[in-house]
Amino acid sequence: MNYRHIFHAGNFADVFKHLLLARALEYFQQKNKPYFVLDTHGGIGYYDLQGDQAVRTAEAEQGIVRFAEHSAEEPLAGAYLNIVRQLNEEQDKLRYYPGSPVITSEFLRENDRLVVCELHKEDAETLKNTPLGRHKQVQILAPMDGYQAVRAQLPPAEKRGLVLIDPPFENTTEFDDVVSALEQGLKRWKSGSFAVWYPIKDELKTAAFHRDVGALSDLPKTLIMELNIRTNDERKGLHGCGFLWVNPPYGVVQDSEHLLPVLCKTLAQDKGANFHSRWLVGEQLLT
């Protein structure tokens, strides 16, 4: 594995991903019953945006820095932005960015549970040495293949919860691996909520991924949400990303109708920016 998320931490894709993740966790909190979260690709947990690697790309400047400045009063982003602010309360400017396991940990109550996986050996060691490693409700399985954890950890004792599948997509088989993981996960936990983040680089590959997921037998309702911040230009790096969300929380479905336009307007880099959402299975066309 060569991918290191520190180069991209806090970019537009992280804002898209983590804002919707935070909204989902807020809805899970609304019921008294405990919930379970499996994060298959946890990274290192905390990211220093002033470190050499992050500064080299400066992607956070067009991501979380811009979003925090221009959407500070957005009600649906309140919990997400508060987590970011609390991590930086002793800083003159935004320096540290929380990865998905850190964000999830902020929503855990006494009986809720988070299992985090990370395969990259160096990142796994870093993750274990963060405050997450001392969190009573958090179990870090690292180094471990997150796809194997889908088979090993499901179904959880808790009746409800979320699986976040957020791989680096550096392997040519990654989309196929995700489809296989979804198939295995749904066999074990049909009522679980499965959120798959993916990059949009090749429209044909993205369409094939949607088609392959849609071909799974007895697939529950599945929502696709996508954000493109500029016209596709390979020389400028990643231009778009999406969530394929099986059994999405109802509140997230409703929130996305408001948040996708906000994200697009705030993070757009040229006139080619756009967003859309649609049901792959079930419900109706949204935007």
Where are the regions a protein language model picked out?
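Class I S-adenosyl-L-methionine-dependent methyltransferase catalytic core
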Residues: 1-287
